[in-house]
Amino acid sequence: MSKRGARTPGYWYDNTPIPLPARMLAPVYGAVTAVRRSLYRRGWLKRHGVPVPVVVIGNVTAGGTGKTPLTITLVSRLQQAGWTPGVASRGYGRDDAGTARWVDADTPVALGGDEPVLIAWKTGARVRVDTDRLAAARALVEAGCDIIVCDDGLQHYRLARDVEIEVVDGQRRYGNGRMLPAGPLREPAARARECDFRVVNLGQGSDAVIPVVGTPVADTDAGFGEWQMRLSIDSVQPMDGKRARPLASLAGQRVHAVAGIAHPERFFAMLRARGIGVVPHAFPDHHVYRAQDFSFGSRLPVLMTEKDAVKCRPFADEWLYSVPLKAELPAAFWVSLLDRLDKLASRHSDA
């Protein structure tokens, strides 16, 4: 198995001893985080809104939890419901991180960031990358968007929000419960209870959806419950432009599987569960691929996540395939969320 680059520290999620420097820095990080949040709560630091509903998708832990598949699915659902959503993102990993820009499906990943380019490619929505989420939201409103989806902006308190959706890994949850860098927490785990919706990413698991906390459909302004999300794969898309084929057509075959995501083993496990023989190649999250990265020494199909695929389009050939990932949540979740957003739209129009 190829392993390149840094990985999530093991002590975040197991009983490995925490290094002394990390233990010493965690209280400092926690104190700074608490002071900053308190300043916003007391109004000493001001929040600024925009004249349309704002939905923030984020997490209180560092690392991937499935926010991007959920963002793509949410944007698609909003479009189907008649909204014109715009997506605000920081665009992590791009070369000119300090520059605000519009992102579409053809934007080079080095300029737009892999996740924003993927979102634009999959949805066709307006996407704006900017370290200042408020400025991004304002630009999207000026461009005609009537709802803002903020990708990974839970801690960006300067932008006022109407709905918060927290996404958490169903297996790892909040790890050892410690603040960065001693643990995975960006904020105390209790912060998650303040969010309107909690989505638990089960990965490739049962499609049964059970609300655990709160009421899944309610008329109140908060406490819409905890929902389980399942990620599914059922097809592969040749990157040379040919038609997609069922993933089942590769059952019993060996493939090279490439993943430059926070938890690459999840992708490999999903392929194995479909009866595919996986030769795994894990790369760092947000890795910038070169053609040489795919010199594996054996000519087998190369399967990769769509997040990786958007970075490989310049040198794609007939051996490279992307695997679309779908986020599946219960119908009641969408009823609850869309009903809330309809009410918010009325409030904003009356303001």
From Swiss-Prot:
Its EC number is 2.7.1.130. GO terms for molecular function: ATP binding; tetraacyldisaccharide 4'-kinase activity. It catalyses: a lipid A disaccharide + ATP = a lipid IVA + ADP + H(+). One of its GO terms (cellular component) is plasma membrane. The keyword Iron does not apply. ATP binds at residues 61-68. It is an enzyme of class 2 (transferase). Keywords: ATP-binding, Kinase, Lipid A biosynthesis, Lipid biosynthesis, Lipid metabolism, Nucleotide-binding, Transferase. Pathway: Glycolipid biosynthesis; lipid IV(A) biosynthesis; lipid IV(A) from (3R)-3-hydroxytetradecanoyl-[acyl-carrier-protein] and UDP-N-acetyl-alpha-D-glucosamine: step 6/6. One of its GO terms (biological process) is lipid A biosynthetic process. InterPro entries: LpxK (IPR003758), P-loop_NTPase (IPR027417). SUPFAM superfamilies: P-loop containing nucleoside triphosphate hydrolases. Transfers the gamma-phosphate of ATP to the 4'-position of a tetraacyldisaccharide 1-phosphate intermediate (termed DS-1-P) to form tetraacyldisaccharide 1,4'-bis-phosphate (lipid IVA). Belongs to the LpxK family. This is Tetraacyldisaccharide 4'-kinase. It comes from Xanthomonas campestris pv. campestris (strain ATCC 33913 / DSM 3586 / NCPPB 528 / LMG 568 / P 25). The gene is lpxK.
